[in-house]
């Protein structure tokens, strides 16, 4: 039996399948590595694959079918996943709070995973990367943000840019 405690991971999964606006805003920034529980990670992967392929959010039924077609699950894992999927309901939460909390969750998980990766590099368990790669791993983790404004929007910022360019300097 799956414990039905509400965590940010479960709240995120619930809203990914129930709230299309939320899904479109956060899905590009969430990685499967942010989910520690294997069953939740698999559900996220299936949601991500479905949205990539069909450009809309999946139903719980379609998720159950997709999970049922996977060959890498034991019967016990499959049953746990189906049970979790059945609990995914649209929690009535404030959208701003949900976005802020999801962003903090992603930042915290990215930093945690970067530190764990750094430790495995230092311990010699990761043979593909050297200790010189640790700063870039941590930099990438610290850069996790839902803010996708990376410059000027030449149409929306035109008034402020016009004023800036025509300002008389003293």
What are these regions (language model features)?
Residues 1-105:
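Noncatalytic partner-interaction/assembly domains of nucleic-acid and motor enzyme complexes
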Residues 14, 147-170:
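The Walker A/P-loop phosphate-binding site
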Residues 35-36, 67-71, 121-126, 145-146, ...:
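Short amphipathic alpha-helical patches
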Residues 89-157:
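Interdomain "pre-motor" coupling segment immediately N-terminal to P-loop NTPase/helicase cores
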């Amino acid at each position: 039996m799956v414990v039905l405690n509400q965590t940010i991971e479960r709240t995120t999964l619930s809203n990914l399948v129930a709230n299309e606006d939320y899904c479109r805003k956060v899905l590009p920034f969430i990685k499967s590595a942010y989910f520690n529980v294997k069953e939740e990670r698999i559900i996220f992967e299936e949601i991500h694959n479905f949205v990539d392929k069909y450009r809309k959010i999946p139903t719980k039924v379609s998720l159950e079918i997709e999970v049922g077609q996977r060959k890498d699950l034991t019967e016990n894992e499959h049953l746990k996943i189906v049970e979790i999927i059945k609990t995914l309901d649209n929690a009535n939460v404030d959208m701003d709070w949900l976005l802020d909390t999801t962003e903090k969750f992603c930042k915290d998980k990215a930093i945690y995973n970067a530190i764990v990766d750094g430790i495995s590099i230092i311990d010699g368990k990761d043979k593909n990367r050297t200790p010189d790669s640790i700063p870039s791993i941590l930099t990438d983790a610290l850069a996790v943000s839902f803010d996708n404004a990376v410059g000027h929007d030449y149409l929306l910022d035109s008034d402020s840019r016009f004023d800036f360019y025509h300002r008389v300097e003293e």
